[in-house]
């Protein structure tokens, strides 16, 4: 799917906002990347897991990632993208954003964990990034 110049402009805006937020947060010593659930919750503390199926989750309830990985460093704590605008990542983000601009749904749901009413992404961080910026 070819993406539009408009969706790429949105990426450049999201990227510029991300860099500004990173610089401000660094000065204030706030966390720079999304929180990782495995830093909050030890596996031994989990009494049960349940598969609720596919749910619609408001983007404001998605607050972090399930596991600490190198991918979480591609985002600000609010999932704004920090990869350079001429990267493969930016091209993929633009394609996802184009889906949102056309009022279509993503072809694949994200997977995540819920803990205390907040959601932590396992798979689908780019989709979350595009959706959070779009909302």
Question: Can you describe what each PLM-predicted range is?
Answer:
Residues 1-116, 122-126, 132-133:
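Short, charged/polar connector segments at secondary-structure boundaries
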